[in-house]
């Protein structure tokens, strides 16, 4: 799959990445190479291969689930940029 400079420009704009015009063509070639490699991977027969999340099978250590009184609010909020009434104060993100 070939990617041209116009596609790179569009993707960069959608991703809010500022790329100078002189870098668009080299990026297009690089992305085309990556997609060609992915197309090669798609040709590999993976029938019968179990999905895996890691290359090494491990078991995570378990710990007792113990209820505590929680931390000291003063210590927890000591590094907070802003706190009020024992809560973190954060900017509003939902309008």
From Swiss-Prot:
<comment type="similarity">
    <text>Belongs to the GatC family.</text>
</comment>
<dbReference type="InterPro" id="IPR036113">
    <property type="entry name" value="Asp/Glu-ADT_sf_sub_c"/>
</dbReference>
<comment type="function">
    <text>Allows the formation of correctly charged Asn-tRNA(Asn) or Gln-tRNA(Gln) through the transamidation of misacylated Asp-tRNA(Asn) or Glu-tRNA(Gln) in organisms which lack either or both of asparaginyl-tRNA or glutaminyl-tRNA synthetases. The reaction takes place in the presence of glutamine and ATP through an activated phospho-Asp-tRNA(Asn) or phospho-Glu-tRNA(Gln).</text>
</comment>
<dbReference type="GO" id="GO:0005524">
    <property type="term" value="F:ATP binding"/>
</dbReference>
<dbReference type="GO" id="GO:0006450">
    <property type="term" value="P:regulation of translational fidelity"/>
</dbReference>
<keyword id="KW-0436">Ligase</keyword>
<dbReference type="GO" id="GO:0070681">
    <property type="term" value="P:glutaminyl-tRNAGln biosynthesis via transamidation"/>
</dbReference>
<keyword id="KW-0547">Nucleotide-binding</keyword>
<dbReference type="GO" id="GO:0006412">
    <property type="term" value="P:translation"/>
</dbReference>
<keyword id="KW-0648">Protein biosynthesis</keyword>
<dbReference type="Pfam" id="PF02686">
    <property type="entry name" value="GatC"/>
</dbReference>
<protein>
    <recommendedName>
        <fullName>Aspartyl/glutamyl-tRNA(Asn/Gln) amidotransferase subunit C</fullName>
        <ecNumber>6.3.5.-</ecNumber>
    </recommendedName>
</protein>
<dbReference type="GO" id="GO:0050567">
    <property type="term" value="F:glutaminyl-tRNA synthase (glutamine-hydrolyzing) activity"/>
</dbReference>
<comment type="subunit">
    <text>Heterotrimer of A, B and C subunits.</text>
</comment>
<keyword id="KW-0067">ATP-binding</keyword>
<dbReference type="GO" id="GO:0050566">
    <property type="term" value="F:asparaginyl-tRNA synthase (glutamine-hydrolyzing) activity"/>
</dbReference>
<dbReference type="InterPro" id="IPR003837">
    <property type="entry name" value="GatC"/>
</dbReference>
């Amino acid at each position: 799959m070939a990617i041209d400079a116009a596609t790179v420009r569009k993707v960069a704009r959608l991703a809010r990445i500022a790329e100078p015009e002189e870098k668009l063509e080299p990026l297009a070639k690089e992305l085309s190479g990556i997609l060609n490699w992915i197309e090669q991977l798609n040709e590999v027969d993976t029938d019968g291969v179990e999905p895996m999340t890691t290359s090494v099978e491990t078991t995570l250590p378990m710990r007792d689930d113990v209820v505590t009184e929680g931390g000291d609010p003063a210590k927890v909020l000591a590094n907070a940029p802003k706190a009020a009434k024992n809560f973190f104060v954060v900017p509003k993100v939902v309008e």
